[in-house]
Amino acid sequence: LKRIITLGLAIGLLTSTVASADTFLRYGEVEGWKVFADQDKKTCLIEAVDDAENVVQMGLTEDRGVGYVGVFTKAETDIKRGEKEAVAILLGDNIYVGEATGMKGNITKGYSGGYVLSDDPQFADDIAKQKVMVVFPEKEFAFTVDLTGTYKAMEMARKCNEEQLG
């Protein structure tokens, strides 16, 4: 059993699908994922939106020491901003347990969701290489996230991140 390291940092996730935010510049797109450069934080993130308008975002914190994965929906949820709950994430044969932080109100109107933080390189590797992520929140029903294309999107984000430092 592996553990997700959670720090409870406030991350400015989901700013409308990010494209409309002033500080985010579209960097590129690959296999259904958009890559954005955050001009303020000098980091990059990847984002995918499914047919039901659910949004998945992944990136690095401003200090680049920790990665995040956020999942947001327009569906009705009981998620409260800042509320933390236990979560387990299955990626291939690996289960990661930790804490998810809820977001509502400070993100795009009509969306709620949460994010996890991790500094485990295996977690990032599994996200890049697996096709599906199964999330088991403490209070809600389990759900799956399609990870198709994450490997190439994460590669593009790495290049984007390197360019932000230059």
Cite the ranges covered by each PLM segment.
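Bacterial N-terminal signal peptides that target proteins for export
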Residues: 1-7
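Bacterial N-terminal signal peptides
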Residues: 8-16
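A generic "folded-domain core" signal
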Residues: 21-166
